[in-house]
Every structure is written in structure tokens, then in C-alpha cells.
Design a protein with these regions (language model features):
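Aromatic-rich, lipid-facing transmembrane alpha helices and their immediate juxtamembrane interface loops
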Residues: 1-232
């Protein structure tokens, strides 16, 4: 499916002479996969060692020991699908209900949808033994094969609300606020501007995702966590 999205991105870019949101999210999310393993360390996530592993990244301090090969691709396709859909929905509702702010619409829509999906997927994955949380802090879902803390899906939902709110706002020329602030809107149309848009999306995605999800998990473990046999 990741490859299909690459083809879709190429075709849409060729047609419109402009990178679509799907493609920007695909590139930004795929390039951000490395954050997964630092966040897993903070959240005490232990992956099933039966998964095929990344060939170039073994054990490393402050990361979970098992690093599945599919993570870059799963990050890419999931965010390339979910974020544009939510942005489209929030933008459409914003036109229907102009008195409601984009931030509130995003919080009311993106947060609960992302939260519900994460709880469902992670809960079923933990139940299937794909991964588990060796140490759990706060309320959690309990299964025969593992536990799922609820704080991390909630943080991801908050990030989604923030990120969608940022992307649901465009100026009359179709540029997002972060592109305007970075001076991209002033650049002439062409591949140089599109390359700048890629880097801008990567920065927005990686910085915001790290602050909301990865840094908070790592800081929480460093301050309040304890030892772990599965995720030392």
C-alpha cells in the first residue's frame, strides 16, 4: 500500500505541478520512523522478536531492542491516509460552520477519532501478541497477552488535533501557515519550491510529533519510570 501511495503522489504531482498533502505526509511520516523506537523505550514497548528487523539498526541506548522492518512503511501509509482525510473533513465542516474555530473543530473531530482508532488497533495488536508494554503507568486495557496504557493513544490524539488544525488553515493561494512563515509562499513555482515544501512538512511533522509523543514519553520514563527487563 505504501508503494501505491508513492505512485499516487507521483501522478498527482505530475498532473497538478504541486505536491499533494498525501505525498507530503507520506514523505514526512516515513522519514520520521526513527522516532518510534525512542518513543517505545519511553513507553516500555517490547516488540515480538519474530518480526523481521531493520538490518541497519540494532540495539541502542534509549531505544527498544527489537526494531521491526515494517515500521517506516507503516508510519508512511497510515499518516498519509489518516491526516489528509481528517484535514478534508475539518476543512469541510469549517465551511459549513464558520463560527466554529478550526482549532476546536480539529480537537472535537481528530482527537476522538484518532484516540478510538489507536485504542482499537493497539489493543488488538497487544492481544495478538505483536507487542506489549512491559511497564504500565496509569489506566490501561488488560488482555491475556499484554496491557495497553491509555495515556499514549491520548497524546497521539492530541497531536493529531494540533497537526490537523495547522493543515486545515490555508491562505488564498493554498499555502499553509508554516509555509508562509518559512518564506515558501514567496518562492516562484517549480521544483525548488516543492522541495522546500517537503522540508517544511518534515520539520513540522518531526518537531511536533517528538514534542507531543516521543519526548514526553522519554521524559516521563526518565523522571518516574523504573527498570525493565524487556526494554532496558
Amino acid at each position: 500500500f505504501w508503494c501505491v501511495l508513492v505512485v499516487v503522489t507521483i501522478l498527482l504531482t505530475w498532473k497538478n505541478k504541486r505536491l499533494p498533502l498525501v505525498g507530503l505526509c507520506l514523505i514526512a511520516a516515513t522519514s520520521s520512523f526513527w522516532q518510534e523506537f525512542f518513543g517505545d523505550w519511553g513507553a516500555y514497548v517490547a516488540w515480538n522478536p519474530a518480526f523481521a528487523k531493520l538490518p541497519f539498526w540494532g540495539e541502542m541506548p534509549f531505544t527498544t531492542p527489537v526494531k521491526p522492518l515494517f515500521i517506516p512503511f507503516s508510519w508512511g501509509w497510515w499518516f498519509a491516509v489518516s491526516i489528509p482525510l481528517l484535514v478534508t473533513l475539518v476543512s469541510w465542516l469549517g465551511q459549513k460552520f464558520p463560527k466554529l474555530s478550526t482549532n476546536w473543530l480539529s480537537l472535537l473531530i481528530a482527537f476522538p477519532l484518532f484516540l478510538a482508532y489507536q485504542i482499537y488497533v493497539e489493543g488488538s495488536s497487544v492481544a495478538n501478541g505483536w507487542w506489549t508494554y512491559d511497564v504500565v503507568i496509569g489506566p490501561a486495557l488488560q488482555t491475556e497477552k499484554g496491557r495497553l496504557p491509555l495515556i499514549f493513544p491520548a497524546l497521539l490524539g492530541l497531536w493529531a488535533a494540533y497537526f490537523v488544525a495547522k493543515l486545515a488553515k490555508r491562505d488564498t493561494d493554498g499555502f499553509w501557515p508554516h509555509e508562509v512563515k518559512m518564506g515558501i509562499a514567496a518562492k516562484p513555482a517549480g521544483w525548488r519550491r516543492e522541495l522546500a515544501r517537503i522540508w517544511a512538512m518534515i520539520v513540522l511533522f518531526q518537531v511536533s510529533f517528538f514534542i507531543f509523543n516521543i519526548g514526553s514519553a522519554m521524559l516521563g520514563r526518565a523522571l518516574f519510570g523504573g527498570p525493565s527487563l524487556l526494554v532496558p
